[in-house]
Amino acid sequence: MSTFKNEMNGNNLLHVAVLAFPFGTHAAPLLSLVKKIATEAPKVTFSFFCTTTTNDTLFSRSNEFLPNIKYYNVHDGLPKGYVSSGNPREPIFLFIKAMQENFKHVIDEAVAETGKNITCLVTDAFFWFGADLAEEMHAKWVPLWTAGPHSLLTHVYTDLIREKTGSKEVHDVKSIDVLPGFPELKASDLPEGVIKDIDVPFATMLHKMGLELPRANAVAINSFATIHPLIENELNSKFKLLLNVGPFNLTTPQRKVSDEHGCLEWLDQHENSSVVYISFGSVVTPPPHELTALAESLEECGFPFIWSFRGDPKEKLPKGFLERTKTKGKIVAWAPQVEILKHSSVGVFLTHSGWNSVLECIVGGVPMISRPFFGDQGLNTILTESVLEIGVGVDNGVLTKESIKKALELTMSSEKGGIMRQKIVKLKESAFKAVEQNGTSAMDFTTLIQIVTS
């Protein structure tokens, strides 16, 4: 990439505005991607815009401060003296309501401070207003979609899906045939806002996003080209340019994490593909009856397990479970997931099927058992189970003793589980090939640099 550095030595008038969504796992991967671009374009100015809370978190833990990236704090949209109503989505809705004007205000500050007009907008794909804003500034617009290509296509097709389902209630929608290469979908498989909860601010934002993304100079996505060619082709037909610049856990700098609970050392003591790893992410915990069912299933099946557990396991798990399973299981408050999934002892990952977790499974070559909760997780489960055939969803999307034991025995002990393992290893090889020099993701990243910094 050194040729870019040589070419860009004179490009000190370029100014890239980066607009980050402050909730969930959105801002961190966008910053990682921008840091990688900024490293290749040291004379280009990058202004990173996000809320104070998120900026404080992102930049306080960053070990590498690049001189050409400066962050600016954007108002979070909460009114003065705000008191939470108890609705966890309320801060998101308030941010969305005010974000367009709040971003504009701080962008003006950055332009005045640097003396450089904005030449490119790199935004979270959620920010549909990037199309008009870039046009006003005579700048390029490059949005980043941090989830999978299949879920993005449902948002591009929202009007088509709503037309097909008409005015039916969600429970009356039996099947929807809309994603190429996917089986027919139920309404419950689709992300919120496509045909349900369509009037809430988040759904409105996603609907507008699907309509506006075709105006972008390029749409970058956290994926690689061979994961689903049919979806890839469909998105290519809708956008000016689709750039696969993932998987991010291979293509962007990864923060070093500690293993304070000794998970990797514990795994070293076990045989290949013998351990069940369990984590449902940092947002949702299964309800009490599902936690009980999972604990009882693990105890009965007898597989060794590591469980990254939110909350107090003594309070939330069956009485005596910790004592009875202490030689077989390890329950920790936090686990180095990426490193665990790369460990040869791990045989399956019981997960909520967030997109980052799916990609981490692929890079680790570990099949998955999915218990989806919300968002794109239902679609991700269908992708891994029915399309890629590298995992299985629990029956009816609920953790019961029967559904868990069935899924564990299928993935860990059956011939079908062995076939899943073979398929995900092939997909892993494709992911690594994509990020090699002249690989599809590597070449798309080169194109991304050219667009953003020229």
Swiss-Prot record:
Induction: Strongly down-regulated by wounding or by methyl jasmonate. InterPro entries: UDP_glucos_trans. One of its GO terms (molecular function) is UDP-glycosyltransferase activity. Highly expressed in flower buds, flowers and pods. Lower expression in leaves, petioles and stems. The keyword Glycosyltransferase applies. CDD domains: GT1_Gtf-like. Pathway: Secondary metabolite biosynthesis; flavonoid biosynthesis. Its EC number is 2.4.1.-. UDP-alpha-D-glucose binds at A335, Q337, H352, W355, N356, S357, E360, D376, Q377. UDP binds at T25, S282, S308, W334, A335, H352, N356, S357, E360. The active site is at H26 (proton acceptor), D124 (charge relay). Myricetin binds at R89, H155, E192, F202, G375. Pfam families: UDPGT (PF00201). One of its GO terms (biological process) is flavonoid biosynthetic process. Keywords: Glycosyltransferase, Phenylpropanoid metabolism, Transferase. It is an enzyme of class 2 (transferase). Catalyzes the glycosylation of flavonoids at the 3-O-position. Glycosylates the 7-O-position if the 3-O-position is not available. Also able to perform 3-O-glycosylation of anthocyanidins. For the flavonols kaempferol and quercetin, a significant activity was also observed with UDP-galactose as sugar donor. The reverse reaction (deglycosylation) is observed, but not with formononetin 7-O-glucoside. PANTHER family: GLUCOSYL/GLUCURONOSYL TRANSFERASES (PTHR11926), UDP-GLYCOSYLTRANSFERASE 85A1-RELATED (PTHR11926:SF774). Belongs to the UDP-glycosyltransferase family. This is Flavonoid 3-O-glucosyltransferase.
